[in-house]
Amino acid sequence: TGVKWDTAERTQKLLGMMSEANRKKVREAQKAGRRMVGGVYKRTRLDEEGNKVQRAEVRFDDIAGCLRTPSGGSSRQSILVVEGRKIRSRLLSPREAARLMGLPDSYRLPPNYNDAYHIAGDGVAVPVVRHLAEHIFEPLLQHAQRTEAAA
């Protein structure tokens, strides 16, 4: 699957970048009694003194954050897997990013992580475009064509 788990030290560093509110989400996931999988993004936030600091923000609601093109470490989404006291982290794989964007597994991705991730980042999900086309754009176009023909 092309996934490589982070070291325990790297996972601890990621957890250390979290605000108290996000660390609370992790503690709640630990108490859930089942495996919890969350998406983690690094964001620049202001601290109490107004200084910009990099923060890790986690969500466990089965919603993936916006996939951004990789220009630096902050644009790469990580996965956090919590099973009781055991917490592991890793980058979202390029194949997982492609799946989130609606690309089939048969779609050939470049071997380089950034090149492959770039295909999915800052894109529009194929299923979303298909839905918009079928339910909004095409009906509007057909209506406009009928209106124009009747005029």
Question: What function would you assign to each model-found segment?
Answer:
Residues 1-151:
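S-adenosyl-L-methionine-dependent DNA methyltransferase catalytic core
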